[in-house]
Swiss-Prot record:
Composition bias type Basic residues, residue spans: 156-165
Region Disordered, annotated ranges: 114-165
Residues found modified as Phosphoserine: S123
The entry's keywords: Phosphoprotein, Transcription, Transcription regulation
Residues of the signal peptide: none
InterPro entries: aKRAB, KRAB, KRAB_dom_sf, SSXRD_motif
Tissue expression remark: Not detected in any normal or tumor tissues.
Biased segments, Basic and acidic residues type: 115-127
One GO term describing the cellular component: nucleus
Family listed: Belongs to the SSX family.
Protein name, UniProt field: Putative protein SSX9
Primary gene name: SSX9P
């Protein structure tokens, strides 16, 4: 129950990192430049270790898993972690986005709540995906509004004070309720 125990278990800045964790860090370090790796906190490094482990586990089980974005850019560094000096790889380093903890949120798909279908619209909705999941390709031209934008524009003014009323259904037959008395009250 003592809060000081948590600090005792946490590795200190000057302490040695266990060999197992260091080996996992070395496996991940080859995907980043030396500068990027030095800037990263250990918590970010651990996240990348787990991402790689999960990817490898899924592929070993036979599932088609997408390659984590940081693993796609193997050409930026050599095995010793030294940056290449030729123009092609330098351009790749500049073009690829720097993976930081804040950008990890964009990797995972955003879960969008399902919107109720409009009357007369029998088409099924397709969930939207984040930009990184689509490999940077836009699904529709930038000038044209997407289907979800069209739905939002069309249904925007209709949704007023009682947005939930369209979910109610009208009863076809009237239901007559009878008052049922408790058996204990009948005995009296």
């Amino acid at each position: 129950m003592n809060g000081d125990d948590a600090f005792a278990r946490r590795p200190r800045a000057g302490s040695q990192i266990p060999e197992k964790i260091q080996k996992a860090f070395d496996d991940i370090a080859k995907y980043f430049s030396k500068k990027e790796w030095e800037k990263m906190k250990s918590s970010e490094k651990i996240i990348y270790v787990y991402m790689k482990r999960k990817y490898e586990a899924m592929t070993k089980l036979g599932f088609k898993a997408t390659l984590p974005p940081f693993m796609c850019n193997t050409g930026a560094t050599d095995l010793q972690g030294n940056d290449f000096d030729n123009d092609r790889n330098h351009r790749n380093q500049v073009e690829r986005s720097q993976m930081t903890f804040g950008r990890l949120q964009g990797i995972f798909p955003k879960i969008m709540p399902k919107k109720p279908a409009e009357v007369g619209n029998d088409s099924k909705e397709v969930p939207e995906a984040s930009g990184l999941q689509n490999d940077g390709k836009q699904l529709c031209p930038p000038g044209k509004p997407t289907t979800s934008e069209k739905i939002n524009k069309a249904s925007g003014p209709k949704r007023g004070k009682h947005a939930w009323t369209h979910r109610l259904r009208e009863r076809k037959q009237l239901v007559i309720y009878e008052e049922i008395s408790d058996p204990e009250e009948d005995d009296e």
